[in-house]
């Protein structure tokens, strides 16, 4: 693919970012799965948070071996507690199998932390090359999965340092009349909040946000949260 949404590697495994919209993620039977959070999205389809959580439970039950879950997200853990499945957790604030401790903002908007694993007293320093506190959770999830499949903590640290971000995820387009132009695919209030907080953490003096509604139904249902 040229500027597409996939990248072909040389291994036997495939990594997919699955979406819960219209239960599309229920078409998958993953060997391992990661649940970062469960937010009030796609409720025009599901009708309630209860039905949305039930869909995530079905997805988790389709996971063949291990589920990795964010222990700081209540909705996620509400689902995990109902499962008869192997679950490993990651977190910043709560007790978990993989934790980020000694978090430091080494330059405005960019973070580093010590990776603390459940089965050792050793820690590994992880430095992120992408901005935003929310990316600590993304990196924790990566570390948890990679450690589980046999990569070293040092390899995880190297991967985190070398990862420069994905398209339309706080992507810098350039400058216009001295203003830095950044594009982000955030289309849910939680995502918008993370994007705006990242920009604020980076110390920009003036912030102008231009929001393009992604769907009419989401905008109507979550209008107050968007505001």
Language model features with spans:
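Conserved motor-coupling elements within RecA-like helicase/translocase cores
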Residues: 7-11
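Acidic, Mg2+-coordinating active-site environments of NTP-dependent enzymes
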Residues: 32-181, 204-206
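Switch II (G3) loop of P-loop NTPases
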Residues: 12-21, 181-187
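Short beta-strand-centered segment that lines the nucleotide-binding/catalytic pocket of NTP-utilizing
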Residues: 1
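Active-site beta-alpha connecting loops in nucleotide-dependent enzymes
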Residues: 166-168, 190-227
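Short, glycine/acidic-enriched loop or turn micro-motifs at the edges of active sites
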Residues: 20, 40, 73, 186-188, ...
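Short, flexible loop motifs at catalytic/binding sites
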Residues: 23-32
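Acidic/glycine-enriched edge-of-secondary-structure segments
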Residues: 177-187, 213-217
């Amino acid at each position: 693919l040229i500027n597409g949404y996939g990248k072909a590697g040389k291994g036997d495994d495939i990594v997919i970012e699955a979406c819960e919209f219209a239960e599309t993620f229920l078409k998958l039977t993953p060997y391992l799965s990661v649940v970062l959070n469960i937010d009030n999205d796609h409720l025009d389809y599901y009708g309630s948070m209860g039905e949305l959580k039930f869909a995530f439970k079905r997805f988790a039950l389709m996971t063949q071996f291990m589920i990795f879950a964010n222990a700081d997200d209540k909705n996620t853990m509400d689902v995990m507690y109902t499962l008869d499945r192997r679950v490993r957790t990651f977190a910043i604030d709560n007790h978990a199998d993989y934790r980020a401790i000694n978090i430091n903002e080494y330059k405005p908007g960019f973070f580093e932390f010590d990776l603390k694993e459940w089965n050792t007293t050793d820690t590994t320093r992880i430095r992120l090359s992408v901005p935003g506190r929310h990316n600590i959770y993304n990196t924790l999830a990566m570390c948890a999965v990679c450690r589980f499949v046999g990569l070293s903590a040092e390899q995880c640290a190297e991967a985190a340092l070398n990862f420069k971000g994905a398209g339309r995820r706080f992507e810098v387009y350039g400058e216009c009349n001295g203003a830095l132009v950044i594009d982000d695919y955030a289309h849910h209030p939680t995502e918008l909040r993370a994007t705006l907080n990242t920009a604020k953490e980076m110390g920009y003096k003036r912030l102008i946000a231009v929001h393009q509604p992604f769907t009419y139904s989401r905008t109507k249902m979550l209008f107050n949260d968007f505001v």
